[in-house]
Regions:
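Conserved Rossmann-like nucleotide-binding pocket used by diverse enzymes
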Residues: 12, 34, 99
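Sec-dependent N-terminal signal peptides
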Residues: 3-14
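Short, solvent-exposed linear motifs at loop/edge-of-secondary-structure regions
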Residues: 30, 142-143
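Short beta-strand->alpha-helix linker/helix-N-cap micro-motif
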Residues: 24-86
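Amphipathic beta-strand/beta-sheet edge segments enriched in Tyr/Trp
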Residues: 20-23, 81-142
Length: 143
């Protein structure tokens, strides 16, 4: 009995504190993404395709979640990429995602198609197609 009373007496004076964790800041390492210029068989749309790709690249970099891979490092051409990416070529330059697309004249409008690929899984994540006037290209770039 004395033994039990001693244990109860000791337990009364034990102070229990919760474990406290303080996280001062998190770090997010930007994901490498390759953003190609939009491919077009029509040379008059080449500059517009470059402008759209540039705006998309700037938007993704400003988010802090992505870092663009320098397009001088690209192995596969835009023309061959419009069919199917060679994922091994993109793994060599250490990119995790690939954003490619095409731009075409469609009467007095343009059609813009984007495809986002996961390089390591070797599959398309998403694909979108937009149709707009040439003057509205910047708005489509921000979508």
């Amino acid at each position: 009995m004395k033994y039990i009373l001693t244990i109860v007496f000791c337990l009364i004076f034990i102070k229990a504190n919760a474990l406290e964790l303080t996280l001062s800041q998190g770090t997010v390492k930007p994901t490498p993404i390759a953003i190609t210029n939009l491919y077009s068989a029509d040379s008059s749309l080449e500059k517009l395709g470059e402008n759209i790709s540039s705006v998309v690249s700037d938007n993704l970099e400003r988010s802090g979640l992505f870092i663009s891979v320098d397009n001088k490092a690209f192995i596969q051409s835009n023309e061959s990429l419009s069919n199917q990416p060679r994922f091994e070529d993109w793994k060599i330059i250490k990119t995790q995602h690939l954003l490619s697309g095409t731009i075409e004249n469609d009467g007095n409008k343009i059609s813009i198609e984007f495809r986002l690929f996961d390089v390591f899984a070797q599959k398309q994540i998403v694909g979108k197609r937009y149709q707009t006037s040439k003057n509205n290209w910047r708005r489509v770039s921000h979508i």
